[in-house]
Design a protein with these regions (language model features):
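Glycine/Thr-rich phosphate-binding loops of Rossmann-like dinucleotide-binding domains
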Residues: 45, 87-88, 213, 248
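Active-site metal-binding motif and surrounding structural segment of the metallo-beta-lactamase
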Residues: 51-109, 198-204, 211-212
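Core dinuclear metal-dependent hydrolase active-site scaffold
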Residues: 2-72, 122-190, 194, 276-327
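Short, electropositive alpha-helical surface patch
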Residues: 89-109, 138-143, 253-270
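A short helix->loop->beta-strand "cap" motif at the edges of active sites that frequently abuts
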Residues: 33-34, 105-111, 233-238, 262-263
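Internal alpha/beta domain cores that form substrate/cofactor-binding pockets in large enzymes
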Residues: 157-198, 202-261, 268, 273-275
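Short loop/turn segments at strand-loop or loop-helix junctions that form parts
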Residues: 38-43, 81-84, 113-117, 200, ...
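Short, Asp-centered acidic motifs that coordinate Mg2+ and/or phosphate
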Residues: 34-35, 76, 202, 237
Length: 327
């Protein structure tokens, strides 16, 4: 993979849908800080009635190793919210990032998160587990600045009427301004205004979940488009991924948005200068191209089978993806 460098700031997108997994994980290096944001990934457990294909599991394994490496190097870790594709989990399924992998690793790292009174009950339990296992308190970060980082007040996870849960956005400034929006889905106008007030050069944002039309009204889809247009006019590099890139509808949407602005509108893989690896969107074809025997997932969960066979198969079948570029 490649880093995007701008003077004293390096940005690495580690795990998101265009890189083969669910998440919005990145690592930002400044002169004095190494900041890991949303250190967790997952795979859509059931899509089109199919469990994750072993090739996608192979990609997931490699990205998890990278998160462990970046956790060990970080001065700061930011958790925007406590959903299973953004954090280490005590009760992880085989395709999520298990907290056991980072126990005792980098004990002095600072961990920044939402204020406790803005947590959903499910999030509260996960914070308790995280604090107990890591043996450290999480720092309430909303609205404060520390070094290169500034944190937002809570904004809605998607639209305010869809979901009462919230996320925390992060601004990092060093020569340029980078903003990680977390799962705003471009549905909250106030979140968009906050981003623009921060005057960013580069934004990594979650786009609308177009792959779930039953959960996204026509009015919401229009609002997401309007907000994407607002950002694309003002932000030099707008990276849209996560929910947006779970289906080919999102790919077409991104292409249309890019064609209507002079600024750079791309996905995470484009930013990292590697081929797009839209593995969830193409799960059906993965099974057609590389059949999976019955019982594979159960055996994998018990540690009886691995993924190397499928990784090597995919390298031959999907040469345009260049899987080794993603290692």
């Amino acid at each position: 993979m490649h880093f995007h460098k701008s003077d004293n700031m390096d940005i690495e997108i580690i795990g998101t849908e265009s890189l083969g997994v669910r998440g919005l994980c990145c690592f930002v290096t400044t002169a004095k800080q190494r900041i890991l944001i949303d250190p967790g990934i997952a795979l859509g457990y059931n899509r089109y009635g199919l469990l994750p294909h072993p090739f996608q599991v192979a990609v997931d394994e490699r990205i998890q190793k990278k998160i462990v490496q970046r956790w060990s190097e970080a001065t700061d870790i930011v958790i925007s919210h406590f959903h299973g594709d953004h954090i280490p989990l005590a009760d992880a399924n085989p395709y999520q990032f298990n907290i056991k992998k980072i126990i005792g690793l980098n004990p002095d790292v600072r961990i920044w998160a939402k204020n406790p009174h803005h947590l959903h009950p499910i999030e509260e339990k996960r914070v308790e587990f995280l604090s107990a296992i890591l043996k450290k308190d999480l720092i309430a970060a909303e609205g404060i600045t520390h070094g290169a980082m500034t944190f937002s007040r809570p904004v809605f996870h998607g639209g305010k009427h869809n979901n009462p849960q919230t996320v925390m956005m992060t601004r990092i400034e060093e020569d340029r301004v980078f903003v990680h929006t977390s799962d705003i889905q471009l549905l909250d106008n106030e979140a968009i205004s906050q981003i623009l007030d921060w005057e960013p050069d580069i934004v990594l944002a979650d786009g609308p979940p177009l792959y779930m039309p039953n959960k996204l009204s026509k009015e919401q889809a229009k609002r997401a488009w309007r907000n994407a247009k607002r950002l694309s006019k003002e932000v030099g590099t707008l990276i849209l991924d996560h929910h947006l890139m779970r289906g080919y509808e999102g790919v077409r949407w991104l292409k249309r948005l890019s064609s209507e602005t002079e600024n750079n509108v791309i996905c995470g893989a484009d930013f990292m200068n590697v081929p797009r690896m839209l593995l969830e969107a193409r799960r059906k074809s993965l099974y057609e191209d590389m059949p999976v025997p019955a019982g594979w997932h159960e055996a994998y969960g018990k540690g009886k089978v691995g993924t190397d066979h499928y990784w090597n198969l995919a390298k031959g079948i999907y040469k345009s993806m260049n899987p080794d570029d993603h290692r």
